[in-house]
Structures are given as structure tokens and as C-alpha cells.
Amino acid sequence: MDFDEELNLCITKGKNVDHSFGGEASSTSPRSMKKMKSPSRPKPYFQSSSSPYSLEAFPFSLDPTLQNQQQQLGSYVPVLEQRQDPTMQGQKQMISFSPQQQQQQQQYMAQYWSDTLNLSPRGRMMMMMSQEAVQPYIATKLYRGVRQRQWGKWVAEIRKPRSRARLWLGTFDTAEEAAMAYDRQAFKLRGHSATLNFPEHFVNKESELHDSNSSDQKEPETPQPSEVNLESKELPVIDVGREEGMAEAWYNAITSGWGPESPLWDDLDSSHQFSSESSSSSPLSCPMRPFF
């Protein structure tokens, strides 16, 4: 049954109804037919039953041809998936072939998301930095009394033995310099009982200082004992000779007598004259003052 026939039936039914209410509907029916049949007016969205798209407007319509088309489309989908599977598997194998390709894929994804999110250049750099491999942290040697600041400098400090107060030693570029500063101060405060970072430096220095001090003490030379012995031996020889001469003179005087011509008086005069000359020639002796 065509659309035109259905439309004619509706018109005829309308005429019958319009006759019951009045004759106005019969007068207007030809105009309505012309309007509906005019080619300028677009057809309604529902068309004849021959087109498969017209059935979608009616939920109660079930066309076997439409069902067949849907089944055919459903059968085509797994075929396409099967055709695409080898290529996807090949791509996956290529991606997982080496870590360099994985890194390239990550960079590509980062670039893609940065472009889609309209990130700033700084944001892109941060994303690239976060994706880079983290370098392993090289732990430096820890020294006693030394710690590192956040900006990379090294500081040294020590506690006093009695008050336990912190003594600031300064800021250094390297950890070794800070450790040496700590060792110097610890050796001054505690001596040999101090625990040092580099004990070999201070032990060797102390032994060298001790050797140098001992050599300095040995430098002043004492007089040679041979010279002292010679001088001490010469003096008693002179005294002994004089005593022997005096003894011989006294012995001769006693034997020859106590006269004025005896040699005893000559010896006494000569000894008296010798003593007066020595007293006058010595600078330490004071001249005798006259009594009058």
C-alpha cells in the first residue's frame, strides 16, 4: 500500500467526519491535498517501507533485511580485528625490543601530552627531567665533627670538653678541609686522647717537634774536659815549686843563722816586693788612703 493511497484514505475519512460537523472541511480539503502533494514541500522523515532507514523511526517495526545487515556488520568486525592484530603485535614487539626504543616512546608520549595540555616550556623541561634516569648517589666519606649544608658547603664544629658547648670552626669547600680543622682543634683541647679523622698527620708532627726540641737543647757545647784538667794540673805545679823554694830557704836560714847577711831576709824582701807590685797592678784593688 503506497503512501498516496494511505493519504487518500485519510482524506476520505476526514471528509466523512467533516460532513458530520459541517461543510467547511469539504471546502478546504482540496487545498490541503495540493499542499501535501506539492513537490516544493519536503517529504516527512518517514518514507516508504522499501527504504531501510524508514524502519528506524518505528520501534515496533522489525525488518529481516535490517537484521541481516547488522549481522553482516558484526561479522566484519572480528575480521578487521584479526587483520589488525599482527601489525599491533609487531609494533609491541618493536617497542619492547630495546630500552632505547622504550625511552623514545616515552619521549613521544611526553611530547604528545605536553602539546595537548598546552604546557609552558618550563613545564616541558620539568617533564623531560622527571623522565630521565636518576643518577646513582655517590655517598662521600663522613668525618667526625663535619656536616654538609643544603647548598653544598661543609661546616665543622666541636664541643668543648668541660662545658659541652659548641665551638664553631668555620665553613669550607671540601669535607677534608673541615675534617682537618676539627682535628687541629680537637688535638689542642684533648691532646692524645682526642679521636681524630687523620691521626697520622698529628702523631708524625709531634714526634718531629720532639726531635727538633731535643736537638736544640743539645746545641750549647760544654767546655772540653781535657782543657780543664790541664789548667787544674798546671796551677798546683806552680804552687808546689814555690812551696819547695820557700822550704829550702827556711832550711838554709836555719842552718846558716839568723844574721843580717842570711839569705832569708833577701827572700822576704823579694816576696814583699812581689806582693806590693801585684796589688798595685790589679784593677780590682783599691789604693790605700793616707792616714794623715
UniProtKB/Swiss-Prot annotation:
Its main location: nucleus. GO terms for cellular component: nucleus. GO terms for biological process: ethylene-activated signaling pathway; response to heat. It is found in: Nucleus. PROSITE patterns: AP2_ERF. Gene3D superfamilies: AP2/ERF domain (3.30.730.10). Transmembrane segments: none annotated. CDD domains: AP2 (cd00018). Keywords: Activator, DNA-binding, Ethylene signaling pathway, Nucleus, Transcription, Transcription regulation. Residues 142-199 bind DNA. Residues 14-51, 207-238, 265-292 are annotated as: Disordered. Residues 207-221 have a biased composition (Basic and acidic residues). InterPro entries: AP2/ERF_dom, AP2/ERF_dom_sf, DNA-bd_dom_sf, ERF/AP2-like. GO terms for molecular function: DNA-binding transcription factor activity; transcription cis-regulatory region binding. Belongs to the AP2/ERF transcription factor family. ERF subfamily. Probably acts as a transcriptional activator. Binds to the GCC-box pathogenesis-related promoter element. May be involved in the regulation of gene expression by stress factors and by components of stress signal transduction pathways. This is Ethylene-responsive transcription factor ERF054.
